[in-house]
């Protein structure tokens, strides 16, 4: 197992959750969410995060239907990942993210009740869960 740094994204039309993790430990930590306008992020904010954390790989969550089929937001998340690759020349992989938002809310609620359920916090923890699930899938 290598010690690559990996950045995870939870794509949304209003907010994009971000997390950073290390392959060596298989764990991630949520970073601040990036605001999006109808799914379009401020690319300068993403550029700053990439320069600060210098990840070796990006993982974008794919919001699939429960039966595994794609929906409109799935197509938009895939397009976001492709744009990350095109703009920043970073390797991008995709990860099924079904139920990560529900899991993120449950984790945050356990830690701090309703006050912990701020949108940016949920998105960041969702990105963390996507990232950790991707690493678990790779290295079990």
Curated annotation (Swiss-Prot):
<keyword id="KW-0690">Ribosome biogenesis</keyword>
<comment type="function">
    <text>Could be a nuclease involved in processing of the 5'-end of pre-16S rRNA.</text>
</comment>
<dbReference type="GO" id="GO:0000967">
    <property type="term" value="P:rRNA 5'-end processing"/>
</dbReference>
<dbReference type="InterPro" id="IPR037027">
    <property type="entry name" value="YqgF/RNaseH-like_dom_sf"/>
</dbReference>
<dbReference type="Pfam" id="PF03652">
    <property type="entry name" value="RuvX"/>
</dbReference>
<dbReference type="GO" id="GO:0005829">
    <property type="term" value="C:cytosol"/>
</dbReference>
<dbReference type="InterPro" id="IPR005227">
    <property type="entry name" value="YqgF"/>
</dbReference>
<keyword id="KW-0540">Nuclease</keyword>
<protein>
    <recommendedName>
        <fullName>Putative pre-16S rRNA nuclease</fullName>
        <ecNumber>3.1.-.-</ecNumber>
    </recommendedName>
</protein>
<keyword id="KW-0378">Hydrolase</keyword>
<comment type="similarity">
    <text>Belongs to the YqgF nuclease family.</text>
</comment>
<dbReference type="InterPro" id="IPR006641">
    <property type="entry name" value="YqgF/RNaseH-like_dom"/>
</dbReference>
<dbReference type="InterPro" id="IPR012337">
    <property type="entry name" value="RNaseH-like_sf"/>
</dbReference>
<keyword id="KW-0963">Cytoplasm</keyword>
<dbReference type="GO" id="GO:0004518">
    <property type="term" value="F:nuclease activity"/>
</dbReference>
